[in-house]
Amino acid sequence: ISKMQNPRILRYLIENTTDESIIRLAKEKLKFKPLSAQEEAMYQGIVNFKNIQGLGGFNDAIIREAEAKLRDGGTYTVHNPDFLTGANISVTLTNEFMHAVENDLDFELRFPDVANYSPEEMAIYNEEWHKVGDVREWEKLGHGVRVYRTIKARELWNLINICATYAAEPGIFFIDNANEMTNAKAYGQQVVATNPCGEQPLAPYSVCNLAAVNLAQFAIKDSKTVDYEALRQTVKVGVRMQDNVIDATPYFLEENKTQALGERRVGLGVMGLADLLIYCEKEYGSEEGNELVDEIFKTIAIAAYEASIELGQERGSFPFLQGETAAETARLREAFVNTGFMKKMPQHVRDGVREYGIRNSHLLTVAP
């Protein structure tokens, strides 16, 4: 609500929400300026031309706007329209929250009870919370947690969806799904955050350089097919380039540098999908279109991991996958090939990691 810049949506929330806090916050964000007597007379004068031939030189849009101003009695805008405009926000949603949404249950909004922490507890919070990032895990560790309020899950779900639809924010991030699939589990880490646009789940202090393959370049227009071999080669060049970027990057925090060099995370994605579908005469969302998209992304995923395995042979695996002994390295590699994501990869890719290791902990990211 604090980032909403559309007064019409704020008014919709006020009129269609039953949660008192949402209504209060929407009202606080909404700004109303009543019409002066002069403005009211001006708009009324415009409306008076509504039923006169030629509309007095005004068009329908101007007359409708004048009617709306008179109906509302003023102009709606928002307070602090520039609030956090330079930041993208995502909301982490848990399985428990989605269960509450599906079953129309109440949901507790919980957070560490920092207001009642002792100085010692606050020091632990400042040092450790960002590494955990999950109030459920924080509570399991024995730290104090407070229920700040209870809300109907569907009210919050509807708020998120309305704001995302009409303001492109917040992003929706299913954190339990991310942790079930992430390769970071192999080396004892977990997802606690995302990058600004929400496409890259991140462990504490993780950073990830991003790149995109232009899919439109791989359409064979005469045959309306895809040049998969050229796509594979481009992906492999892209992975090699991004691995080089990791070493060429200036890091502002030592923790970022340690994490970046330790897991060597890269995010290769795509652009130009719509153009490719047009060139191949496939409709977006159709069965044929979806089959083509599946094949394209399967090709990219396999090629990227094959390239990283080759780099692992040349340059060594990412350090977090290297143990102090051969047995420890083998254990880490086995854990890696059994993450939620890697279980979906072809057997030859998993076997390649077991035998040669892999240069990068993560490889694929499609930006929104």
Each predicted region: which residue ranges?
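Short glycine- and Lys/Arg-enriched binding-loop motifs that mark or flank ligand-binding interfaces
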Residues: 164, 184, 263-265, 366
